[in-house]
Amino acid sequence: MASSTRIAQRYASALMDQALADGTLEQINSDFQYIMSLVRESDEMVAVLNSPVIRYNAKVGILKEVFGSHVSTLMMNFLIMLAEKRRESILPDIAASFTEMYNEEKKFIPVGFTSAVELDETMRATLIDTIAKRTGKTVLPTFSVDDALKGGITI
């Protein structure tokens, strides 16, 4: 396990603990989804997060301007703390670790289904129900079609 992954897990765990204590778990999860959607869409945001040249005060100003009115106080304080500790470049890893912890806490299991043809609603429901019964978790499904498959389904 890479060092940055362990560090990201520690930050995610601390944020998870605080969100559970504050009763803001759903809001923090929503905040991460919003933040990561912007990061995925913006090369400029990735450059800001990864830049060692941008000073702390400037970075905090950018984070407040971009996210301030869209995320909770806890998340904004967390982002500022990451900038202060110069850990903002691992934000995507922290978000991924947090999402794993969130899914575990909520008993969600993400499952990807790939089939040779589009599955009808009955087949989709049967697959989801079968996996939910076997795992005891709520399935978060994604479905895709791969013409290269000769038949069947990969999970």
Residues of each region from the PLM?
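Elongated, mostly alpha-helical coiled-coil "stalk/stator" tethers of large membrane protein machines
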Residues: 1-154
